[in-house]
């Protein structure tokens, strides 16, 4: 949506939300979307007419302060550019092995390997999980692919007249992989963190797993943050037993909390599937609200319950992704925010306190444990106000925690550095 709006707005820079949306020049499907969600149109317009130009000026003034954070992120982006992307429909690309002979020659393709029969679906699942971990995945779960959770069009490698209404038969199973972003960098969001470290690692793991499956004779397609998704990840992750859907709209896992970037590999290898889990996230999110209270854009619903918030047929807390993306483009350092990941009480490294809390809370019918934990986080740990994360003069481009030492430009770089401050 955002790219489509941007392309249309660049061709019609004098258009404003006071004009009919039909005059903007976006596809009819997007016209209908904006009519259903007019606030998204207002936010998209603000992002490209105001926020991005202002951010460019801010980077001229403050950019040196974030240069090492940008450099750190750029390394992952550079590697990600080498990862392969499907160039033909699933019925073609998923059934061939892509081989790159050398960097200066186009990749070659060869047929799938001879199909290897597994003794049982249980052993197939065990093998897949073992190799996925060794390919770099921290978490692995398996479920059946749900046609309701495929994107309605735009699958990679597919022409416009492709029939997107039918799920490819070989997308029977979905293997969901998850990895965390670097913990000390996560806490320095929204200004110093990057999504690309975990994007790169989970994408690499998924593409390796795709290659493994194809060698064994099974068609496969990796859906990754670096090379694109043809399906929606969070509900598949929930069904694969990795976690539960939180107030933020992403899957919160017992091991990593919200600090988990995910990829999916679809295939037809028969495997034993996992079951959804319940460790109390839904009830905890109802009373917590730390992510919503901290969100600089106000994109996360403050409602006590998602009752009545039905999006695409499923009930979950509303997220205004237009407001969210607008703040992405306001921040300094690598693009994005990730503040909701950083502040979430579940997003903590393993230690005895965190392990005890996540063990006791689901087993406490009184709610005393969760109430006590929330009181401690809200009263014993300092954090910037939501407004502080904005640009000066309203805020100071605050970070939830100070960046790790290796991202502090003032320590390493011989540059004139201006640190943002309120009113400055």
Language-model features and meaning:
Residues 1-20, 303-424:
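Flanking helices and flexible, charged tails adjoining ferredoxin-like Fe-S electron-transfer domains
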Residues 1-183:
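Non-catalytic, usually N-terminal nucleic-acid engagement modules in DNA/RNA processing proteins
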Residues 5, 9, 33, 37, ...:
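Phenylalanine-focused residue identity feature
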Residues 129, 138-349, 354-364:
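Catalytic cores of enzyme domains
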């Amino acid at each position: 949506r955002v790219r489509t709006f941007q392309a249309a707005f660049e061709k019609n820079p004098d258009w404003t939300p006071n004009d009919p949306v039909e005059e903007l020049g976006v596809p009819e499907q997007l016209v209908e979307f904006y009519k259903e969600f007019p606030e998204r149109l207002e936010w998209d317009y603000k992002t490209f007419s105001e926020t991005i130009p202002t951010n460019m000026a801010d980077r001229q003034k403050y950019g040196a302060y974030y240069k090492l954070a940008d450099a750190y992120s750029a390394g992952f982006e550079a590697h990600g550019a080498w990862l392969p992307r499907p160039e033909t429909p699933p019925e073609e690309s998923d059934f061939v092995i892509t081989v790159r002979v050398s960097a200066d020659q186009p990749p070659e393709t060869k047929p799938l390997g001879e199909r290897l029969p597994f003794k049982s679906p249980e052993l197939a699942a065990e093998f897949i999980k073992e190799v996925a971990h060794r390919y770099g995945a921290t978490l692995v779960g398996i479920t059946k692919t749900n046609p309701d959770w495929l994107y309605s069009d735009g699958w990679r490698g597919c022409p416009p007249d492709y029939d997107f209404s039918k799920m490819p038969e070989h997308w029977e199973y979905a293997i969901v992989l998850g990895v965390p972003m670097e913990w000390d960098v996560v806490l320095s969001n929204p200004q110093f963190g990057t999504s690309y470290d975990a994007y790169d690692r989970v994408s690499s793991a998924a593409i390796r797993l795709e290659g493994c499956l194809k060698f064994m004779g099974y068609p496969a397609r990796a859906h990754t943050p670096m090379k694109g998704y043809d399906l929606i990840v969070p509900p598949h992750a929930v069904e694969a037993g990795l976690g539960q859907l939180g107030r933020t709209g992403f899957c919160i896992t017992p091991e990593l909390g919200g600090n988990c970037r995910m990829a999916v590999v679809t295939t037809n290898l028969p495997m034993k599937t996992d079951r959804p889990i319940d460790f109390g996230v839904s009830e905890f999110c109802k009373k917590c609200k730390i992510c919503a209270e901290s969100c600089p854009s106000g994109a996360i619903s403050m409602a006590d319950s998602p009752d009545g918030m039905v999006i695409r047929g499923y009930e979950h807390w509303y997220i205004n992704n237009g407001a969210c993306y607008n703040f992405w483009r306001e921040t300094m350092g690598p693009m994005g925010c990730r503040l909701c990941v950083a502040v979430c009480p579940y997003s903590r490294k393993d230690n005895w306190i965190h392990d005890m809390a996540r063990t006791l809370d689901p087993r406490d019918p009184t709610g005393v444990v969760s109430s006590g934990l929330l009181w401690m986080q809200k009263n014993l740990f300092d954090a910037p106000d939501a407004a502080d994360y904005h640009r000066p003069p309203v805020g100071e481009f605050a970070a939830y925690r100070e960046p790790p030492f290796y991202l502090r430009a003032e320590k390493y770089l011989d540059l004139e550095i201006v640190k943002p401050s309120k009113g400055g």
